[in-house]
Amino acid sequence: SGELDDARRIATEIGIAHRVVETNEFANPLYVQNSKDRCYHCKTELYSQLDGLSESLDVQVVFNGTNTDDLGDYRPGLQAASEHSVVSPLVECGISKADVRSLAEGWNLPTWDKPASPCLSSRIAYGEEVTAERLQMVDLAEQWLKENGFVNLRVRYHRGDIARIEVPIDQVASVAANEL
């Protein structure tokens, strides 16, 4: 995906190791059915894999990037983090998303102004099955739009062959006029 490619590139740019952890959330029907606690099941799979990896690497603590702004949202994945003893240092230090951006800019990190990019599964309406094919369709559509100059966007999958493109108000006319 575009996010994975970005992560690899940025890790190389800033000189840190990058490791891809394979997960198998599609084997869990509770994830695939896409109920409102989908994130819990996905994060449980991720943190279970990280438990094994951290043990094999003799890593004592797994951190995540949860910040204080995330605490006011519905985030069932936070329960999975708690169950797996994942630490949220940004929350512990009282750091918000705006603080993260400010710190990253001050450290000249290339991602300081990157638009938010929630999980692709969040682009599929609750109750619609999450499938690899649907996620790939959303990812390819978003990548194509980004390559054609659109930023801060979402493509949402709806039942059947319907996709909804969400862009900032100043880009709506370009999408509607098919000026791509």
Map each language-model feature to its residues.
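Secondary-structure boundary/capping residues
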Residues: I16-R19, W112, V172
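Acidic-residue sensor for enzyme active/binding pockets
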Residues: E3, E142, E166
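A short interface-forming secondary-structure element
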Residues: R159-G160, R164-E179
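ATP-dependent adenylation/nucleotidyltransferase module used to activate substrates
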Residues: S1-G106, E147, A163, N178-L180
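Mid-to-C-terminal catalytic subdomains of enzymes
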Residues: V91, I95-L145, G149-R159
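Generic alpha-helical secondary structure
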Residues: Y47, T131-V138, A177-L180
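A short, flexible beta-alpha/helix-coil linker loop
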Residues: F26, A125-G127, I169-V172
